[in-house]
UniProtKB/Swiss-Prot annotation:
Catalyzes the reversible isomerization of glucose-6-phosphate to fructose-6-phosphate. This is Glucose-6-phosphate isomerase. One of its GO terms (molecular function) is monosaccharide binding. Pathway: Carbohydrate biosynthesis; gluconeogenesis; Carbohydrate degradation; glycolysis; D-glyceraldehyde 3-phosphate and glycerone phosphate from D-glucose: step 2/4.
Amino acid sequence: MENSLSLDLTKTKPYVEEHEIQYLESIIREMDNTLGKKTGPGNKFLGWMDLPINYNKEEFARIKKAAEKIKNTCDVFIVIGIGGSYLGSRAAIEMISNTFYNNLDKNQRTVPQIYFAGNNISSTYMADLLELVKDKDICVNVISKSGTTTEPAIAFRIFKELLEKKYGKEGAKERIFATTDAAKGALRTLADLEGYETFVIPDDVGGRFSVLTPVGLLPIAVSGIDVDEIMKGAADARQEYSSDNIEKNHVYRYVAVRNALYRKGKTTEMLVNFEPCLHYFGEWWKQLYGESEGKDGKGIFPAAADFSTDLHSMGQYIQEGLRNIFETFINVENPRKSIIIKEDKENLDGLNFLAEKDMDYVNHQALRGTVLAHNDGGVPAIVLNVPELSAYYFGQLVYFFEKACGISGYLQGVNPFDQPGVEAYKKNMFALLGKPGYEDMKATLEERLK
């Protein structure tokens, strides 16, 4: 096993003391046992727990084979999905690939350009994307359990038409890959009818926990990232976080501290990074915790920030605003690349004291200074140390946060594996759009909107 993630809770004191963590140990252990024995709410959606070791090896091999086909066939790869159907893969690709992977010259890339669609209903976004890719060789991965989710269904209609016009029906079917239910749903029916290659979304894995299934693995593999290393990292994390000793289990300690802070009125957790490539990891994390904990009038509100950028916009509020915040910093110990700051003879900017230092050194001092400043301002800080941003540590991070999320949801007394609240806006939207069966509701809503 490589070096693991490590947790520094020094700057959560005096808000949470060690005896409070120890007090929660037996409760957390009980919640973990509930997860493991599959006796709690949502127990039909716990397939993610053993995915790192019990994944479908035959399908995994097909994913890698399909990824090679896509890389050899296409200039552009379009990933169509929303929420958990795209955030995990995008988080991995942005974290591990070149920051400007889509802008590199073709001779500098060994993989297609990768763009995401079906995660909004903006006509401008779609029109701009179509304009960008219309003259390129395109492959599409449409990801939807049902095939009827509005955003990806609209996007797939548009790209299916584009590909069939461009390549004909036979040519298009070789370029469309569907990740969907094993046996039922509109997308499964269409894929079988048209002859698309398909990959299965397991019945026992919810969308926001699905990054280690074909949902995330096919786009990640197309990007050139080593999916074997991702699974290895997740498997090692699964083993490490199986300990029931709170002194050794960082998942237990993270759950204990964030929930102790929540009980003391710290109702917002900010996941903070100092690497721009972690932006979409923050978006993935927000969905994971927002949908899992935010119900029954409960839950820690998940926010994310990209420092030092957001220190120049949100820094004032974090330092002196409402004291209901705590932060979880992702500290990347070793950057992928280094840049040395050179000496300047004029020194008009006064920065020669940084000459011959690595930019990453400056970045780390900014992180350390921010932790101290915010702590002085009444904001507790959890620091999660990550040795480097690689496929292996992406797998570790995913499993760390997923397991912590499951335990934390049970600790708060909610079902962390459903999301009934997301249906409310959909019903209103369908009624206002005139979907058959919503006629009475449409009239009521139109009256309310006057």
